[in-house]
Each structure stands twice: as structure tokens, then as C-alpha cells.
Design a protein with these regions (language model features):
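Domain-level detector for secreted/extracellular nuclease and nuclease-toxin modules, and
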Residues: 24-73
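Composition-driven detection of intrinsically disordered, low-complexity segments
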Residues: 7-8, 91
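Extended amphipathic alpha-helical heptad-repeat regions
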Residues: 64, 68-134
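Sec-dependent signal peptide cleavage junction
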Residues: 17-25
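Cleavable N-terminal signal peptides
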Residues: 10-11, 21
Length: 134
């Protein structure tokens, strides 16, 4: 009985250690979206996307496939909503809208399948820099 328990416990530990961790999702904290928010990249599907989520795992921005241009409008709305609480001026909104494609340009040309965690962090920081200057 003791051997069976030891064997069972050993197998359990081995399975826990050997269980695969998804290498297709990379996350990096995003200063722009506030504490606890991350920019996550998921490459499980043919269309890779970024999604912004908070520490309660609530989706904040959107699922944004890169090859669907209509999602640019949805992303504009998400960014606009982030700004609305701080500054409701027309000037701020027009600057956000005029620069939104620059934000997309950073992510569009990445080879997402080969992007490592440090690269995800780098591009999240670059997005933050763009957001701060909108």
C-alpha cells in the first residue's frame, strides 16, 4: 500500500512538472492601461491578436485580428474610452484617431510565432510610448 501511494504521488508530481505551458501567449504589463493591465499576444489561431486585460481577467479592449480593418474602429473606441475619463476635449480625440494606425503598424509586421516574452514586453512599451504622446 505504501509503495502504491508513493508511486501515485510520484506520478502526480511528474505530471505537474511535465505538463506543457502554452508558449503561444505572451503578456507584458502595459503602463497606459493602468496598474494590473497587460497586453497579451495569442498565437494559437491563424490570426494572431492582442487583447488588453486586467488583473481580474476581464477583457478591457478587444480581440483585434490584424487583417480585419473594421477592428481599427473598435480599437479607436477602446482607446477613446480610456481617454474619456481624463480628457473629453475634441483635440485629444482627434489626436488619438489620427495616430491609431501608427499603433497598429508596430504590431502588424511582427512575426508573432517567433516573438519571445522580452519582445512582447518591448512592443507593449512602444505602444505605451505612442499612447502617451497622442
Amino acid at each position: 500500500m505504501k509503495k502504491l501511494l508513493c508511486l501515485t504521488a510520484g506520478l502526480f508530481v511528474l505530471l505537474c512538472i511535465a505538463s506543457p505551458v502554452s508558449a503561444s501567449t505572451y503578456s507584458a504589463e502595459s503602463r497606459y492601461f493602468g496598474p494590473g493591465y497587460e497586453v497579451s499576444m495569442n498565437t494559437d489561431t491563424r490570426m494572431s491578436y492582442w487583447i488588453v486585460w486586467n488583473s481580474q481577467d476581464e477583457a478591457k479592449a478587444l480581440d483585434i485580428p490584424f487583417d480585419e480593418i473594421q477592428n481599427v474602429d473598435a480599437f479607436k473606441d477602446a482607446v477613446d474610452n480610456c481617454y474619456r475619463a481624463e480628457n473629453d476635449s475634441i483635440i485629444a480625440k482627434s489626436r488619438i484617431w489620427s495616430n491609431i494606425l501608427n499603433i497598429f503598424a508596430i504590431f502588424r509586421y511582427m512575426d508573432l510565432r517567433d516573438t519571445a516574452l522580452d519582445e512582447a514586453s518591448y512592443y507593449a512599451e512602444q505602444a505605451d510610448v505612442l499612447f502617451e504622446h497622442l
